[in-house]
Amino acid sequence: MGARSKEARHRWFSRLPPDASSSFLPCKRPKSVAFVLWIRPSCFLRESLPAELSGLPGLPLPPQAPTNTMNCGLPEAALSVIDWGRLKSGDVNEGARLLSACDDQGFFYLDLSSEPSFLHDHKSVLHFMDQYFHQGLADKMKDDRQSDTHGYEPVATSTGALNTLPDYYESLKASRDELHGDGRNLAPAVCDRQDLFLRFSDMMHQMVIAILQELDCQLGFGGDRASFQDFHRKDAESLTTLSMFRYPKQETLDLGVGHNKHTDIGTLTFLLCDQWGLQVLSKDPAGWRFVAPREGHAVINVGDTLRFLSGNRFRSAVHRVIPTQRLQHEDRYSIAYFLRAANDTQFTDSAGRQVSAKQWHDEKFDVFRETHEEQEKMPILTGGMERLENLPGIWCGVRLTDGICHRLGAEDC
């Protein structure tokens, strides 16, 4: 389940110049490939991005923000705050505010102050992540499962937040079906703490399903009209996944940067992160805005599947992760629970095709591993949202030619 398709062969690094000095690293790859190349700075970057690029349209790189939640002068997204305690108790006003947030922004905070036990488990998982990700690479690669839903994935396996550079995060994943099954594909470290991960992920699952239930209620779905819950049957296979990410502290940009712009594949994403770096593409005001971390809050966002199932009513917002300065100056940790519909769920995608939830999942992960140039030709990475909303600056960035950084303005996008 969630295995990488054999068609995912293309890589951004296939376009390396012949004189590129490179390093070899065991990495997430097609089964027929034993290694990948990492670009060295002598080919493309002098040392790091020049300071004058800090105001680049579509690629804000403001001064480094601390890890706490104080306002640091960064351009912040104005997101609604939904109180989980009120929502689960059936507060009508809170349900209406939830519907409005999904309609208008597709992103909102979920206040979890009513769940102290869950917040304690969050700290326990962060402690686990700190220990796991600081193992040697060889040890972590033993958990590589060649899968997009379980196992370990090293840095630099997909395109990053800057043109010509790969991503710079590593991850450890555990699918819901595996956690509740025999666990044969789980990393041994996850199996050792399976009680924690089951309790932690089950609580997130309970909350996102409750959000779907409230949306069904607000829209009057049910009866003869299939509800959102109907596409998340307990007895159906799905690619719902718990993902743990680390964006390592870096000294240079030569190995990659951030997490490329995209919309999420599934129904709802439940995100926990206490550090800056997440940006959402806002409609009003138009442009990239940081999602400020809030203690005791999760960030919930609508995914492509829920947008399609809602008849394109809900907004699946484009987002990315990028350092608040040119480099990631400290390890950044985030946890995401990706709720995904049953594999056999059918919907009409942004191109007008009738596809299954599994097909959309597999195709989109393949596009993640394409080059930036190829991604710009396809609507799937951002779910067609960049064309639907016609927001300026989504493709703006940096082009690196002959070792020199060139600014791309709106006229180049």
Curated annotation (Swiss-Prot):
UniProt binding sites for 2-oxoglutarate: 332
GO biological process, alphabetically ordered: terpenoid biosynthetic process; viridicatumtoxin biosynthetic process
Protein residues bound to Fe cation: 262, 264, 319
Main enzyme class: oxidoreductase
InterPro entries: DIOX_N, IPNS-like_FE2OG_OXY, IPNS-like_sf, Iron_ascorbate_oxido_reductase, Oxoglu/Fe-dep_dioxygenase_dom
Residues forming coiled coils: none
GO molecular function, one term: oxidoreductase activity
EC number(s) given by UniProt: 1.14.-.-
Domain Fe2OG dioxygenase: 235-341
Keywords: Iron, Metal-binding, Oxidoreductase
Pathway: Secondary metabolite biosynthesis; terpenoid biosynthesis
Biotechnology annotation for this entry: Viridicatumtoxin and its derivative, viridicatumtoxin B, exhibit anti-methicillin-resistant Staphylococcus aureus (anti-MRSA) activity. Moreover, viridicatumtoxin and a C2 acetyl analog, spirohexaline, have been demonstrated to inhibit bacterial undecaprenyl diphosphate synthase, a potential new target for antibiotic development.
Keyword Zinc-finger: no
Pfam families noted in UniProt: 2OG-FeII_Oxy, DIOX_N
Role played: Oxidoreductase; part of the gene cluster that mediates the biosynthesis of viridicatumtoxin, a tetracycline-like fungal meroterpenoid with a unique, fused spirobicyclic ring system. The first step of the pathway is the production of the malonamoyl-CoA starter unit for the polyketide synthase vrtA. The aldolase vrtJ may be involved in the synthesis of the malonamate substrate for malonamoyl-CoA synthetase vrtB. The polyketide synthase vrtA then may utilize the malonamoyl-CoA starter unit, followed by sequential condensation of eight malonyl-CoA units to form the polyketide backbone.
Family statement: Belongs to the iron/ascorbate-dependent oxidoreductase family.
Listed name of the protein: Oxidoreductase vrtI
